[in-house]
Structures are given as C-alpha cells and as structure tokens.
C-alpha cells in the first residue's frame, strides 16, 4: 500500500490491485479472526467494481455465492471495510437466499433480520479489522 491505512483513506486513491488486496484480506480477517464460516465453508467469489455502477455499496448474490463491492461508492476505508464485512456476513447466513425477500417484504430492508445482523457484525468489528489491515500491510 502506498499510503498509511486510516479510517479516512480514500479508496479512489488506491489501485485496483490494492483494493482487491484489501478485500481479500478482509475476507481472511472474517474467516480466520472472527471465525465466520461462509456457506459450504468456501470463500465467496469477490468482484470489486472500481467505478460507480449503482447507489449501493455492495451486495451478496446467494445463488452464485458472489460478493460484489462498488468501490467508487465506498469513499473511505471505513466504508469499504464496513461493506466487505457486511456482505461477507451475508455469505455466512443460513437461508439468506430463501428467506431474504420474504423478510424484506415483512419487515422492510432496514429491519430485515439478515441486514440487522450484517450491520451489527460490521459495526462491532470495523476498528479491529482496520488494525488487522495495518498489521497485514506493514503499517
């Protein structure tokens, strides 16, 4: 990494390779530090779009076990870390592919139990994850 990794590190200042390295290291952190096991005990695929594609920060597609991150929407390292942890959490949630839509209809997006859990996991672990990234990248 060219810059010191801090909360406010601008994602747009990083190369595609650096952004992917961060994404994979966050996956490693979730799996090995937080002990979160994704569906089938296999890492989900990771696709990072460097340019703006949507208004959301990321999404998880359960049918193909794919985490998509929209890096241009994640202005800072803090938002990027939150988003990757959040979407990785979805890859670990049982029945997410079956019940997600019905829960969204019943509770709404913001009160969907899958979303509540993913936001909580990201919020509780973002600081330690950023510290992990600083150590992993020698900063």
Residue spans for each PLM region:
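Catalytic glutamate of the conserved HExxH
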Residues: 83, 87-95
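Charged phosphate-binding loop/patch that engages nucleotide di/tri-phosphates or the phosphate backbone
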Residues: 2-12, 18, 123-139
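Catalytic zinc-binding patch centered on the HExxH motif and its immediate surroundings
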Residues: 40-41, 45-66, 75-78
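Surface-exposed helix-capping loop/turn segments at secondary-structure junctions
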Residues: 32-41, 98, 129-136
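Short pre-active-site segment immediately N-terminal to the catalytic Zn-binding motif
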Residues: 67-84, 108-110
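Zn2+-dependent metallopeptidase catalytic core
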Residues: 15-41
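Short, aliphatic-rich beta-strand segments
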Residues: 5-8, 65-71
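Post-HEXXH active-site segment of zinc metalloproteases
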Residues: 78-79, 93-122, 131-134, 138
């Amino acid at each position: 990494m060219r810059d010191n990794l801090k909360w406010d590190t601008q994602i747009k200042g990083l190369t595609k390779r650096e952004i992917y390295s961060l994404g994979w290291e966050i996956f490693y952190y979730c799996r090995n530090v937080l002990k979160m096991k994704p569906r089938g005990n296999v890492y989900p695929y990771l696709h990072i779009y460097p340019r703006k594609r949507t208004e959301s920060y990321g999404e998880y597609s359960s049918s193909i076990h794919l985490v998509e991150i929209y890096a241009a929407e994640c202005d800072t390292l803090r938002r990027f870390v939150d988003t990757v942890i959040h979407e990785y959490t979805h890859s670990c949630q049982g029945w997410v592919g079956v019940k997600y839509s019905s829960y969204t209809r019943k509770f709404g997006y913001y009160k969907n139990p899958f979303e509540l859990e993913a936001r909580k996991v990201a919020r509780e672990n973002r600081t330690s994850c950023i510290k992990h990234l600083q150590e992993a990248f020698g900063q």
